[in-house]
Amino acid sequence: MKDKSVRKELERQGYRFVGNLGAVKICQWAKKDLLDKGKCYKSYFYGVNSYSCCQMSPWIICENKCIHCWRAIELDMNKFIDKKNIDNPKEIIERCIKQQRKLLTGFKGNAKINRQKFKEAQEPMQFAISLIGEATLYPKLGELIRELRKKGKTSFLVTNGLNPKVLEKLNKNKQLPTQLYVSLNSPNERSYNKWHNSKTKNAWKKFNETLSIFPKLKTRKVIRMTLVKGINSNMKDEMVNDYAQIIKKANPDFIEVKGFMSVGFSRDRKGMGYDAMPTDEEVKDYSVLIAKSLGKPYQILDEHKFSRVILIGKEKSKMKIKKNEV
């Protein structure tokens, strides 16, 4: 990164840079789990260990500037980045683990730490490729996922869905992650453009292309929704059927319906303060409407009240990740 002020601001927030374009940061749930004070909803839903999760990204740039994003979308990363210097996948993984260990060093002297978890956390076995930016812009994403799989590590990739050709290539080369997420926050083109502020031409069209190929991608698939209320509401009753039609087209295994949290940079945006945060009951009520509109086999499978997340899916027995799905 060329601009030291941007780098300094992100490091102040807990980010650590790996190579030219990658970053890693310790998740709050990883810290809580090390102290036996709680686990991420993904741990409850899918069986991955929060304390052994590495939250990272190989590419800190994103095409969108979503209004609900807690990341530093106001900072134009493009002018500070040398995109010609592409990081090596193996080196990214090694550096992420190295930085993760450094960030965890302070826990070693904590008398309340779970020693066994701390020991296992030195070699993270779950990589959440979702920290910042859009990972499908990273030209060597397939190699990165393949390296993680070779090491027996699970990988969760979150994408904005604007690069369908990348996903098709990952599918063709058998380099899809353990679990693939596509973010769905708008039920129509008008709402989508207002919500995402994308730099990509025909973003709504490309997003729908991704949804169209989603059913044939050979991995566990999730649609992730973030609900916001107030002047930027994307959880109106009249939107439910449109959401359901979009989800049916994608035919995911699961739908995570999350309540917006006013944290990070999102707090400073108009209409995105604490009043925009739906309660866990409001999230659940809206999830019930979506599940009802989807119809069978979709149903409410689980919930994590603290995180305000509801899981909709087809089969409860398929929630936990099996060894052959890594």
Residue positions per predicted region:
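Short, solvent-exposed linear motifs at loop/edge-of-secondary-structure regions
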Residues: 48-62, 249-261, 289
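Short catalytic/ligand-binding loop motif for oxyanion handling, primarily in non-cytosolic enzymes
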Residues: 65, 75-78, 189, 263-266, ...
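C-terminal accessory regions of radical SAM enzymes
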Residues: 248, 280-326
